[in-house]
């Protein structure tokens, strides 16, 4: 259930919202005979304030309450194996994480360039943390490591973000995004190990990292569109190890055919086959190195046909209005 109220007074506009959610979740693992029903409800207020500095620039101040629900894998108690010595087991007792998100932003438009910047702070309780520990057995003398998510931390994330849209020519558009943030986490995990000894793991850590994305769209002769997307996630540290940086490039070509009633596309996902999750794990008695790749390079050819409707460009002003509304709804519903 959701309600909102907004208005504009001169150069100042505001939008207030309130969302209510009532959730019911049941985990029924027949193999392990585990049944865990969960019920929770929450109110999610939001407020968006904007002041128009000039025809081409504005500042904004926003707040929203957000929820991050555990994925299916996080609540499934059935173990899945990355290898015979490294397994992941979900936690049916895990709860959603709740965040208070604040940001202040600035937007400026030039003839061919649009710059959007923001500084933000997110405070999260019940943050998910993956606890890695020895299961107590060995395979060929190597300890078996089990990875399980728990709600055991408070997380404060502070950062800034830049987004730049550059319409160089009618046939060439470029979009860039850069996001830098500091992540401070506090929490402890207490458990009894395989030797029946009580252990306390401290999960306090403070780390900086960043992410960037560049997207280009070029209109080639014969009405062929060429789009390229490149991303890079910087290395990250966490309490029990490190994760290497990840770079990846996707590329696609598309062309409208059959009097713009159909579109044929060719897409290459992860051209350089570099989207790999590489981790170094350091436990008190075990060090491990792992590589994981969900999907290797993929090439996809597709054809889309639109019945009774041609592909047409809508009014640019109407598109901008819809995009602005979509961003607000993304913040409200996230």
PLM regions and their residue ranges:
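Residues on the lipid-exposed face of transmembrane beta-strands in outer-membrane beta-barrel proteins
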Residues: 3-7, 47-51, 104-108, 119, ...
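C-terminal beta-signal and adjacent terminal beta-strands/loops
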Residues: 255-334
């Amino acid at each position: 259930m959701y309600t909102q109220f907004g208005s504009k007074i001169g150069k100042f506009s505001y939008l207030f919202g309130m969302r209510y959610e009532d959730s019911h979740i049941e985990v029924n693992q027949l193999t392990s005979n585990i049944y865990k029903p969960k019920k929770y409800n929450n109110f999610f207020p939001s407020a968006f304030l904007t002041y128009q500095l000039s025809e081409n620039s504005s500042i904004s101040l926003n707040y929203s309450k957000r929820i991050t629900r555990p994925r299916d894998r996080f609540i499934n108690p059935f173990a899945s194996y990355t290898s015979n010595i490294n397994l992941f087991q979900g936690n049916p007792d895990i709860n959603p994480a709740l965040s208070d998100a604040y940001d202040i932003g600035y937007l400026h438009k030039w003839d061919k360039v649009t710059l959007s910047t923001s500084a933000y702070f997110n405070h999260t309780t019940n943050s998910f943390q993956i606890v890695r520990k020895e299961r107590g057995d060995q395979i060929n003398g190597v300890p078996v490591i089990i990875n399980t998510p728990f709600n055991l931390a408070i997380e404060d994330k502070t950062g800034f973000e830049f987004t730049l849209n550059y319409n160089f020519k009618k046939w060439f558009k470029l979009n860039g995004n850069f996001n830098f943030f500091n992540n401070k986490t506090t929490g402890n995990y207490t458990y009894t190990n395989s030797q029946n000894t009580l252990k306390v793991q401290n999960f306090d850590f403070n780390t900086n990292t960043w992410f960037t994305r560049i997207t280009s769209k070029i209109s080639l002769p014969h009405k062929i569109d060429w789009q390229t997307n490149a991303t890079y996630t910087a290395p990250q540290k966490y309490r029990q190890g490190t994760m290497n940086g990840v770079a990846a490039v996707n590329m696609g070509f598309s062309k409208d055919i059959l009097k713009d009633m159909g579109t044929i596309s060719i897409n290459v996902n992860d051209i350089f086959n570099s989207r790999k999750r590489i981790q170094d794990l350091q436990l008190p008695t075990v060090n491990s190195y792992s590589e994981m790749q969900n999907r290797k390079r993929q090439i996809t050819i597709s054809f889309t046909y639109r019945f009774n409707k041609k592909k047409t460009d809508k009014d640019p002003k109407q598109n901008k209005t819809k995009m602005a509304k979509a961003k607000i709804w993304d913040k409200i519903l996230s």
